[in-house]
């Protein structure tokens, strides 16, 4: 039988083309499935990293497996949308554990690494000094010690007052700057006033501001930010109610959570919102729910 070689070669060529296309299709499917699988793995890693970051930053501890799974189950259906992240963070901010950590973070930050035991130890020392004053009928010593005790007591009650929403972070930080521990760290009026500007306003005072601040604390009297003051409590009231303080809080929040200073728009908007609402948690929610924080 005679073979039609022309037809035979055509058949072979078509078979090769069909086989090649089939292989390419198989390969394409495999690659696509592989990419989807890799994307899913990355998504899981990102969500777990986000969960751990939130718990460490807000509660000072790592999230448990149960907590991570709960966050994953809430974020996965929305592809970790900003709205779903916002909801998760809002559920954490405002809990009792959050306020306890907020207090401990601040006393460590502003009282040179102090903890609750440091505060109670300092109070015991003042109680002992008061007892010595009472034994010697030394009224000056008694009043000095009692004043110190009262100021530390105002620090000790901070966590409960925050939970009860009696006051917010501005009052907490004012109390942390007005006690024997802070005084010992920043001894003398020049050091004390300068440290207040650096620690809470995130800038150094101008020479005029520094001099006026010292005059107020030394009861000479002066004007700071357009407000008259005569005493150290007056100075602290002026600082912690000023627009400059809220500017500093915005700077502090960005440095703490995304390790940079806010840009001009972020600084302006954050400060205006804080001055208007005194809602520090809203500022934190804005930063913590951002894509920048999620992807850092």
Model-derived features with residue positions:
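Composition-driven recognition of low-complexity segments enriched
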Residues: 21-296
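Bacterial Sec-dependent N-terminal signal peptides
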Residues: 1-33
């Amino acid at each position: 039988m005679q073979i039609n070689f022309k037809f035979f070669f055509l058949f072979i060529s078509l078979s090769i083309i069909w086989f090649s296309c089939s292989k390419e299709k198989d390969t394409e499917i495999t690659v696509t499935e592989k990419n989807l699988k890799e994307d899913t793995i990355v998504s899981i890693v990102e969500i777990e990293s986000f969960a751990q970051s939130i718990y460490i930053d807000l509660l000072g501890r790592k999230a448990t497996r149960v907590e991570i799974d709960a966050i994953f189950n809430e974020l996965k259906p929305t592809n970790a949308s900003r709205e779903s992240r916002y909801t998760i963070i809002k559920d954490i901010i405002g809990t009792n554990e959050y306020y306890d950590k907020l207090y401990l973070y601040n006393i460590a930050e502003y009282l040179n690494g102090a903890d609750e035991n440091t505060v109670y130890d300092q109070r015991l020392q003042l109680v002992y000094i008061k007892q010595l004053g009472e034994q010697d009928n030394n009224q000056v010593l008694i009043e000095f010690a009692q004043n110190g005790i009262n100021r530390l007591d105002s620090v000790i009650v901070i966590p409960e007052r925050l939970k009860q929403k009696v006051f917010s972070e501005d009052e907490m930080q004012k109390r942390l700057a007005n006690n024997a521990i802070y005084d010992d760290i920043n001894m003398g009026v020049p050091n004390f006033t300068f440290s207040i500007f650096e620690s809470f306003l995130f800038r150094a005072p101008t020479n005029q501001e520094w001099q006026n601040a010292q005059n107020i604390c030394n009861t000479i009297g002066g004007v700071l930010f357009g407000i008259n003051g005569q005493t150290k409590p007056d100075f602290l009231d002026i600082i912690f109610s000023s627009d400059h303080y809220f500017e500093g809080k915005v700077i502090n929040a960005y440095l703490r959570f995304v390790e940079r200073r806010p840009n001009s728009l972020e600084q302006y908007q954050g400060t205006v919102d804080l001055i208007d609402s005194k809602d520090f948690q809203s500022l934190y929610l804005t930063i913590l729910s951002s894509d920048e924080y999620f992807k850092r």
